[in-house]
């Protein structure tokens, strides 16, 4: 069975859509962020990043994807930065190695929302670590959104869709019958 990989910005709705997809398809969800917390012995991601930095977190994501490359029949709910690594200067760059693994693992679905909508959704959310002390989330999004688009096999704008409708569209695209009808 094919794996479904959900990518998109922080706040796009990947976790909600993945749960709805799972409910409709009976395919289990694996969250890269949940696995990361598990792998660090329960340390929340903001704390891990604070203690170890983003570069270490991006390495952790890569090791998680390596472990999942032979997975079969999962919905992979990816953290917003899954497609990125940091260069020597600490700038975000496309992670070819992670993208290659994601493409090996399954079909990539980009869950898209507008920048304004995303900025509003994550404002003041303390469960999410700061992406940068200097750069605004808006400018990070401006760089990331085209990368998500390029990486995806399928793009779905969630602005006017419920999580259930989004899940149905993804299942239709993949050719899996919804079990909840």
From Swiss-Prot:
Species for this entry: Leptospira biflexa serovar Patoc (strain Patoc 1 / ATCC 23582 / Paris)
Annotated S-S bridges: none
Principal location: cytoplasm
Taxonomic superkingdom: Bacteria
Gene that this polypeptide is encoded by: aroK
Name listed for the protein in its UniProt record: Shikimate kinase
Keywords recorded for this protein, A-Z: Amino-acid biosynthesis, Aromatic amino acid biosynthesis, ATP-binding, Cytoplasm, Kinase, Magnesium, Metal-binding, Nucleotide-binding, Transferase
Residues that bind ATP: 11-16, 128
Top EC class of this enzyme: transferase
């Amino acid at each position: 069975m094919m794996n479904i990989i959900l990518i998109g910005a922080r706040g796009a709705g990947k976790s909600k859509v993945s749960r709805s997809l799972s409910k409709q398809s009976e395919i289990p969800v694996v969250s890269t962020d949940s696995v990361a917390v598990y792998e660090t012995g329960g340390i929340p991601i903001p704390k891990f990043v604070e203690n170890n930095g983003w570069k270490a977190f991006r390495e952790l994501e890569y090791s998680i994807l390596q472990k999942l490359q032979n997975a079969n029949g999962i919905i992979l709910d990816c953290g917003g930065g899954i497609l990125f690594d940091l260069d020597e200067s600490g700038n975000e760059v496309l992670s070819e190695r992670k993208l290659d693994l994601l493409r090996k693992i399954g079909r990539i679905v980009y869950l898209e929302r507008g920048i304004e909508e995303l900025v509003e959704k994550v404002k003041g959310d303390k469960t999410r670590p700061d992406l940068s002390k200097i750069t605004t989330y808006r400018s990070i999004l401006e760089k990331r959104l085209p990368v998500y688009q390029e990486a995806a096999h399928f793009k779905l704008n969630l602005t006017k869709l419920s999580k259930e409708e989004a899940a149905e569209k993804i299942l239709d695209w993949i050719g899996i019958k919804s079990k909840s009808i």
